[in-house]
């Protein structure tokens, strides 16, 4: 039996949004298996909203890097978040990429400021190595100004999926003690 190569790692169920169709509404997290291995090609840190706890996210990524270094593996680490402020800046040098999903008008306004700043820093430092992914639901996409430069981002149009099945080839696990 082959092992899955991607891990969706739940670190918290806390979230500032209360989306009626949120994937988390369809899971019993007490029954979700605990992570028991780290030899994945990709680890996706998710929640709830992980960046409610930016220091813990940073410590977790450092711990994962230490463990996988000893194992001789080097997984890509992605952070799934809706937060687009200084907390995001704090974690950027600890991950291979972010997957940002703005949820409301305030998120869009913060994203536009961050995007402008990122565009100014394009080509400086580690920016060429970071994967920037932007998930946009239709109503959020319509809030973006016409002609906004999204060239740094891999943009994915999103829609709510009932019951949110785990994609094939992925494990969905949680840390032992959720934040």
Residue ranges and their predicted role:
Residues 1-32, 38:
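Canonical Radical SAM [4Fe-4S] cluster-binding loop centered on the CxxxCxxC motif
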Residues 14, 66-67:
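Positively charged, amphipathic N-terminal segments that serve as targeting/anchoring signals
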Residues 23-29, 39-53, 67-87, 94-114, ...:
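Core AdoMet radical
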Residues 54-58:
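Metal-dependent catalytic neighborhoods of phosphoester/phosphodiester hydrolases
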Residues 59-62, 113-114:
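Charged helix-capping and loop-helix junction motifs
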Residues 92-99, 146-150:
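Glycine-enriched alpha-helix->loop->beta-strand junction motifs that scaffold or abut catalytic
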Residues 122-179:
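Auxiliary Fe-S-binding modules of radical SAM enzymes
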């Amino acid at each position: 039996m082959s092992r899955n190569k991607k891990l969706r790692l739940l670190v918290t169920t806390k979230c500032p949004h209360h989306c009626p169709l949120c994937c988390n509404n369809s899971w019993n997290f007490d029954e979700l298996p605990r992570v028991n291995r780290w030899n994945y090609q990709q680890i996706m840190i998710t929640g709830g909203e992980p960046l409610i706890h930016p220091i813990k996210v940073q410590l977790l990524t450092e711990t994962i890097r230490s463990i996988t270094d000893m194992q001789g593996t080097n997984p890509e680490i992605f952070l799934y978040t809706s937060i687009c402020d200084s907390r995001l800046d704090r974690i950027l040098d600890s991950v291979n990429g972010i997957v940002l999903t703005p949820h409301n008008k305030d998120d869009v306004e913060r994203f536009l400021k961050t995007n402008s700043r990122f565009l100014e820093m394009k080509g400086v430092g580690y920016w060429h190595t970071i994967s920037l992914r932007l998930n946009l639901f239709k109503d959020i996409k319509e809030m973006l100004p016409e002609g906004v430069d999204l060239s740094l981002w891999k943009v994915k149009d999103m829609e709510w999926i009932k019951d949110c099945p785990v994609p094939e080839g992925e494990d969905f696990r949680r840390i032992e003690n959720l934040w």
